[in-house]
Swiss-Prot record:
Gene field: rpsQ
One GO cellular component, as annotated: cytosolic small ribosomal subunit
Positions of transmembrane segments: none
Family statement drawn from the similarity comment of this UniProt entry: Belongs to the universal ribosomal protein uS17 family.
An MF annotation (GO) of this entry: structural constituent of ribosome
GO biological process: translation
Database matches in Pfam families: Ribosomal_S17
Protein's name in the database: Small ribosomal subunit protein uS17
Length: 87
């Protein structure tokens, strides 16, 4: 029998920009994209809503999130770990 790999899901690392919701956080994930014409690398930011079951995150924390089933209208990610707490 084949085993279903749970680790085949996407993982992203980013900073928490909002934790005002109940058991939810907003994570800003930054990536570099090369400009098509000029070749300069541009920083693009994607904001993800993630599920924080224990409400352990604060604004400015660096966190790792993993893709999961839809939990609400906008939440499709869940908190895996807090990499670094904000100072």
């Amino acid at each position: 029998m084949e085993e279903i790999l749970r680790n085949a899901r996407k993982e992203r690392t980013g900073k928490v920009v909002s934790n005002k919701m109940n058991k939810s956080i907003t994570v800003a994930v930054e990536r570099k994209v090369k400009h098509a014409k000029y070749g300069k690398f541009i920083h693009k930011t994607t904001k993800l809503m993630a599920h924080d079951e224990n409400q352990e995150c604060g604004i400015g924390d660096t966190v790792r999130v993993m893709e999961t089933r839809p939990l609400s209208k906008l939440k499709r990610w869940r908190l895996v770990e807090v990499i670094e707490k904000a100072k």
